[in-house]
Amino acid sequence: MMIHGFQSSHRDFCFGPWKLTASKTHIMKSADVEKLADELHMPSLPEMMFGDNVLRIQHGSGFGIEFNATDALRCVNNYQGMLKVACAEEWQESRTEGEHSKEVIKPYDWTYTTDYKGTLLGESLKLKVVPTTDHIDTEKLKAREQIKFFEEVLLFEDELHDHGVSSLSVKIRVMPSSFFLLLRFFLRIDGVLIRMNDTRLYHEADKTYMLREYTSRESKISSLMHVPPSLFTEPNEISQYLPIKEAVCEKLIFPERIDPNPADSQKSTQVE
């Protein structure tokens, strides 16, 4: 679980034609949470919902990508009821008490699992998403480079009635000639499973595209008996033990025509 600092902050950083923005503030007020839950057709939202937190990468011409909690929750699949109920029943069996069955078996994804990969920005100009076989060069990322800018933003977190954690956070680091972003959804249901959905975004200053890699990993706790339980709460450590269930590599290609006179950009609603 992340350590929460509730001091609001807003930071901007310029990387060539790009403006990187990280905004962090308090959790949403209960009235706003209820309104959003109705809009998303969900009976409840994560107990710590940072609806105004955002990490944005925007070109001077208006196109770009951002990461926010509301759009992430739009990608929660509330219709895979059988899978969720099966998981809830297994969780129920792992508990010594019996009063939790009604609590966890609900007609929505109470784990808030999301395959959100970001929200594309721009109106007339937009990043074009195309499949690719190219991968992010992890060796380049291991090179010791000066970190010009770093920020981490928590989007939501829920402790699943003290029986685990469901969280979504995004962090970015900027080097002299590139930037790298990691959006991570992490789910741990005590005694049942661990799931991790990662979106990595990488851009080198001399390229006309970003590389985006999405991986979904998951394992039942019963398959992790060889792993020290202390690692179950450490996403960076446990990830190597979680089998990959899905992997998607994409290029986010810049528009061919870049507006020489960037106008005020409008945020779109295209969620990836």
From Swiss-Prot:
Residues 173-272 are annotated as: Interaction with PPP2CA. GO terms for cellular component: cytosol. It holds the Pfam family TIP41. It is found in: Cytoplasm. The modification N6-acetyllysine is found at residue 106. It comes from the Eukaryota. The modification Phosphoserine is found at residue 265. InterPro entries: Phosphatase_reg/MetRdx (IPR051330), TIP41-like (IPR007303). May be a allosteric regulator of serine/threonine-protein phosphatase 2A (PP2A). Isoform 1 inhibits catalytic activity of the PP2A(D) core complex in vitro. The PP2A(C):TIPRL complex does not show phosphatase activity. May play a role in the regulation of ATM/ATR signaling pathway controlling DNA replication and repair. Isoform 1 interacts with PPP2CA. Isoform 2 does not interact with PPP2CA. Interacts with PPP2CB, PPP4C and PPP6C. Interacts with IGBP1; the interaction is dependent on PPP2CA. Associates with a protein phosphatase 2A PP2A(C):IGBP1 complex. Interacts with PPP4C and PPP4R2. This is TIP41-like protein. The lineage of its organism: Eukaryota, Metazoa, Chordata, Craniata, Vertebrata. The gene is TIPRL.
